[in-house]
């Protein structure tokens, strides 16, 4: 100690720590009809079909900022919760949603306006909550997937916090009665307790990237939690357990990638959904997914 006084810091430096999880890249949901999926994800929501990968008729990757929906053909899968989206223009979104009724009649498709967001249900029952950009609440995102909220049984949140903190090595916090698990700079998994009976897990998955890819693998593998070995860069697990007693608290497939995975932080093409052939402005075709520096 040289007697030099410590500087007073006006910021909570721990807020900048990401921990071991650095990417929420996609949510994977099977869809039985690619045409209806295009009508919903591309025409109604205004997302962008990936122009380079999965361009055939049996799968679609739909870009939303730095994240994606992966939509392979198969029996419909329904996430037990809500996917949060930030989309740039509420009025234009409502216009697109209204126009999409003609293509999605006879399905579960619906949307409802609320203060601060629009609740949208896909043709097969998946729930989306669409927000306008709001730096104070959702970070500096203008187009993206700030959270995936999952419905869980009563009494499970303390154990789930222990799992993600001790086993996965990321930070958690309780807000408004829900558990927020940080999974990237401005992205969260949110777990909210409910008394409603939940359907059995149907195989849908979320994809995360880990810094300590090998260390977390070893901790999960010691408990027999690894469910699939995909490649040198990727593995999966399904069960979220309480580290204290091993009790299974929730099931959702986690596709885990390393930071050496060839697709890690792959730049994604995002279109400006306001640009059409009838309302065209040269140089404005692309959407900017983040706000400029303050």
Question: Where in the sequence are the language-model features?
Answer:
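Vicinal oxygen chelate
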Residues: 1-20, 22-32, 50-51, 60-67, 72-151, ...
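Conserved active-site tyrosine of GNAT-family acetyltransferases
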Residues: 37-42, 125, 159-167, 220
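Minor-groove-contacting beta-hairpin "wing" of winged helix-turn-helix DNA-binding domains
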Residues: 58-62, 179-181
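Solenoidal tandem-repeat scaffolds enriched in leucines and small polar residues
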Residues: 152-157, 161-162, 168-173
């Amino acid at each position: 100690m040289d007697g030099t006084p410590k500087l007073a810091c006006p910021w909570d430096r721990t807020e900048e720590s990401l921990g071991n999880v650095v990417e929420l890249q996609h949510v994977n949901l099977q869809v039985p009809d690619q045409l209806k999926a295009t009508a919903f994800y591309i025409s109604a929501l205004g997302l962008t079909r990936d122009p380079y990968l999965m361009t055939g008729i049996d799968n679609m990757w739909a870009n939303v900022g730095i994240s994606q929906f992966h939509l392979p053909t198969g029996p419909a899968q329904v996430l037990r919760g809500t996917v949060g989206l930030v989309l740039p223009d509420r009025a234009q979104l409502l216009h697109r949603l209204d126009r999409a009724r003609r293509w999605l009649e006879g399905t579960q498709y619906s949307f409802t306006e609320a203060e601060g967001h629009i609740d949208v249900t896909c043709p097969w029952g998946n729930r989306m909550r669409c927000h306008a950009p709001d730096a104070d609440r959702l970070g500096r995102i203008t187009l993206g997937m700030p959270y995936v909220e999952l419905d869980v049984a009563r009494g499970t949140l303390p154990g789930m916090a222990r799992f993600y903190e001790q086993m996965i090595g990321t930070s958690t916090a309780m807000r408004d009665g829900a558990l927020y698990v940080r999974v990237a700079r401005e992205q969260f998994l949110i777990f909210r307790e409910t008394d409603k009976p939940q359907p059995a897990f149907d195989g849908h998955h979320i994809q995360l990237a880990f810094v300590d890819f090998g260390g977390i693998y070893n901790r999960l593998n010691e408990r027999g939690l690894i469910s699939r070995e995909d490649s040198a860069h990727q593995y999966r697990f399904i069960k979220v357990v309480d580290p204290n007693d091993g009790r299974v608290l929730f099931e959702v497939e986690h596709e885990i990638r390393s930071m050496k995975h060839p697709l890690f932080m792959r730049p994604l093409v995002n279109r400006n959904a306001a640009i059409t052939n009838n309302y065209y402005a040269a140089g404005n075709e692309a959407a900017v997914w983040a706000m400029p520096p303050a």
